[in-house]
Amino acid sequence: MRFYLKRFTQVISIFLVIALANFTFQYIFPNSYQRFFEPIPNKVERPTELEPNEFNVEVSLMRLGIPTGAVDGVWDQRSRQGFCIWRELTGRDLNRDVPDLAEQRAIVETQRLTLDRDFIVGVNINKACQSAVWVKDATMQNFEIIYVSTGVEPGGTDVGTWSITWKVNRWYESVQIPDGWMYKPMFFAYKGQALHGSENDSFVHWYPASHGCVRMLHKDIEKLWSAGFGLGDKVRVYGKWQG
């Protein structure tokens, strides 16, 4: 019994010595103590710059929030739409051409997009690119880029800056076009033109295909409704389709 009591006393003594040493070190050298017990951070490697090729160009556009269709390294009409949007939002001449090597490098090096002074808070519809930039507040930094399909030319969707005058939160059949069903339309122009979803998202083509309205994907018109976009909010239509 005396043996175990002696061993217990020795263990307690060792514990007290360690605790006292730890407390003393912490009190005398607080900065060193904190650094000693801080976790060692993982080494973060600098991101490797992307090489300018078909796949990485699409990846770069996607990271910038520019839709390009499938990110697969195969450039199609949706990719050309993305190139057009990128050119607009980086201050270049608008076209849907495939980028040359210099432009490919510029795309993968682009860090941010910039809206010019003509953009307004609201939905800005570019007929040349068949795209819309939804600017959500006056900072002009909070925006989203989406596909649209405007009216068939000549004529098509009226150019100008308009306000939403009325909207219908359900499927609605056009008065002017029999069996012309619109999903949750928001009307803005005096000729009954509207932002709306179509019977099928596949009807939102990369080219002008409507009777004058602005077709959107269902998810995008839903976002507008969910955000409270509506009466009095602005719709700006500009540009010219050159297919």
Task: Kindly give the residue locations of the regions a language model identified.
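Sec-exported extracytoplasmic/periplasmic mature domains
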Residues: M62-P67, C84-R92, R112, D137, ...
